[in-house]
């Protein structure tokens, strides 16, 4: 019952913030782990890990693209989805690194299911298709278009 009231208050606050943003013609920065809020109020999204932006794009880029940083995939994998027949959620394994002693290379490599040697050694460049940017060695050479296989 308590969660119902929390959601109602949250919806009212978000509505007031959106109205104020529209009335003043200004921008708003929303910092949250709640992807439902992101989907409701954001036009552009930046996903951060260990203090760095590892993926950014339009709301559509982040919520509908098949290409994602492994951390972003993990965030979506930890959300219940009634449209997908999944027996279990797939949360991100491991713990955040110590911010005072970040690992070399990609800061996510210790938790990444796709970790390669280069991930441990070299910080990834930012790969972009114009509106969607991903900082991950998996996307080296990515132009935003899915390669067709024959």
Model-derived segments and spans:
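Short, small-residue-biased leader/transition segments that mark boundaries at the very start
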Residues: 1-5
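P-loop NTP-binding/switch modules centered on Walker-like glycine-rich loops
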Residues: 9-87
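Short catalytic/signature loops enriched in Gly
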Residues: 58-150
């Amino acid at each position: 019952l308590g969660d119902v009231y929390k959601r109602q208050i949250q919806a009212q606050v978000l509505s007031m913030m959106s109205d104020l943003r529209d009335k003043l013609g200004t921008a708003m920065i929303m910092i949250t782990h709640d992807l439902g809020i992101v989907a409701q109020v954001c036009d552009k999204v930046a996903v951060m890990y260990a203090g760095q932006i590892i993926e950014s794009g339009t709301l559509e880029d982040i919520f509908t693209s098949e290409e994602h940083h492994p951390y972003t995939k993990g965030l979506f994998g930890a959300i219940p989805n009634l449209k997908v027949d999944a027996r279990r959620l797939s949360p991100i394994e491991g713990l955040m690194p110590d911010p005072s002693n970040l690992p070399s290379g990609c800061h996510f490599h210790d938790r990444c299911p796709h970790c390669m040697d280069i991930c441990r050694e070299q910080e990834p460049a930012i790969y972009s298709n114009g509106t969607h940017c991903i900082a991950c060695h998996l996307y080296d050479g990515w132009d935003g278009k899915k390669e067709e296989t024959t």
